[in-house]
Amino acid sequence: LLEAYRGSISQLEWMSPATRQEALAKLEQFTVKIGYPAKWRDYSSLQLSATDLVGNVRAAEAFEIAYEAGKLGKPVDRDEWHMTPQTVNAYYNPVMNEIVFPAAILQAPFFDLEADDAVNYAGIGAVIGHEIGHGFDDQGSTFDGPGAVRDWWTEADRKAFEERTGALIAQYDAYVPADVAAHYEQLGQAAPHVKGALTIGENIGDLGGLGIALKAYKLALARKGIESFDQAPVIDGLSALERFFYSWARIWQQKSRLERAELLLATDPHSPNEFRCNGIVRNLDEFYETFNVVPGDELYLDPDQRVTIW
């Protein structure tokens, strides 16, 4: 994934040599943490009760506040994790310029030792690409390689970046989750839309993550002497790219109550899963070629409307 980002950044036509050099330097300084921390937190002083829920919440909050206050005046612990190993998630920490992948996300549907590369690159590969992408999104791009807030962009490059992110914001502003749309149609009211500006950081991560994962998969095939996706083996009647895109769709399967969907729509910096999947693939040319998507199809976007950032 890092190699794919390196190659992509090196070839970006909208980025000047000065900014490209800074971006590549930041990429080389990423720290990667996988699985679990080198040392474990000690929770022995946290006293909990099986019969006092509110008391437990208060005790946990007090414990955490004391833990954070105890860091004052001490050197920064660069080995610290801010997510437990049993959490199915991952994160990017801009002040450390680190990407962290807990053990729990290294399982199906994201990663499966029995699955082929197409499936895994669209799963954990896209997650890795997403977290790297946060280093170059609307917020992460304001930090440099060592993790300091610094403007390392030329004015023209920042403008070009914002033009692309603006187009992505406009795409997502138009989306309404299917269940929410159906509910408001019954009410005869206008349905709330995805907030493109609120979700732009995560949408940049998703778009870059899947696009770079696809490039990384192509690099992996090339190492095996396979020069194109068409030459990759067909498995269970599915081509390599079909398996890739189906794997991407699978990781975003979700069921939720309408009330939950509306709450997330109003407050969550992540787009609804429906659009984390469909809103991304419609920007990738390979999706159109794989499934013969043509004008008139629901996910079709004119080529000049498709957004590529990284």
What are these regions (language model features)?
Residues 1-131, 135-310:
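Intrinsically disordered, low-complexity linker/terminal regions across diverse proteins
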